[in-house]
Amino acid sequence: MPRTDNDTWDLSTSVGATATMVAAARAIATNADNPLIEDRFAEPLVRAVGVDFFTRWVTGDLVAADVDDHDSGWKLEHMPVAMAARTRFFDSFFQAATQAGIRQAVILASGLDARAYRLAWPAGTTVFEIDQPQVIEFKTATLAKLGATPQATLRTVAVDLRDDWPKALVEAGFDKGQPTAWIAEGLFGYLPPEAQDRLLDNITALSADGSRLACEAIPDMSEVDTEKAQEMMRRATAKWREHGFDLEFGDLGYQGERNDVAEYLDGLGWRSVGVPMSQLLADAGLEAIPQTNDSVSVADTIYYSSVLAK
């Protein structure tokens, strides 16, 4: 079902299911030989959500190669490698920000992100997690049952990013006078183009000089064969449905021309450095992800780290 302005979801449906998929990929990456990342909470969180498809994938009962359409550029088997590199990027961003003295962090659309629990935060750090109420409630309760303890002062902000989240964030104790480290991981593709701009405007308005932002940009779609891309998504959906999971991936994102993230941020006073996923993979010694013209490959995604100088 296509997205609507006021749609809702949990971690087993719609956009929420993609958070579970990403957590499953992190779990597999964590359990790999010589793992690049360590997210010990990913697997138990995926199991708690209870989507059989992802649970079987994490445990090895479902093999990605059996699910993937081998003629497509988008494959489930690429996910653990890609998410390992992506996770490392955002983990390193927070590490660099705290080493620079920042003690306030915000995770936008936090989903099953467990960084507040698994990273080594300096004393005095406050981490804010923002997501829909039922997502926040589920993750917080599940981690409590696991005996997990936040490694920083954790303040959850149960609000939809389409609502007045800046007000809710400030009411939760956010200090606009202090530099902040923000991350928007895996988020922009699920926002309409104008909502992406509005989010960046709000982040800027809330940020003190010296704040930092890490995000990923939707690649240029101009050279993508749209008809082939749509057919690829239909095939992928059909293959997943055969294995018991029905999610129309083509309905989850928003199309339309977007402002270039780096250029837009530069106009707001940020200075950005971008690195493509292909470079993150190479830097980590991970296998490259093949690129095709039937879709935008995850290898095309650009990851930005920005600093605000008002």
UniProtKB/Swiss-Prot annotation:
Signal peptide annotation: none
Gene3D superfamilies in UniProt: Vaccinia Virus protein VP39
Keyword flag ATP-binding: no
Binding locations of S-adenosyl-L-methionine: 131, 160-161
Record carries keyword Coiled coil: no
Keywords: Methyltransferase, S-adenosyl-L-methionine, Transferase
Function (record text): Exhibits S-adenosyl-L-methionine-dependent methyltransferase activity.
Family: Belongs to the UPF0677 family.
Name the record gives this protein: Putative S-adenosyl-L-methionine-dependent methyltransferase MAP_2076c
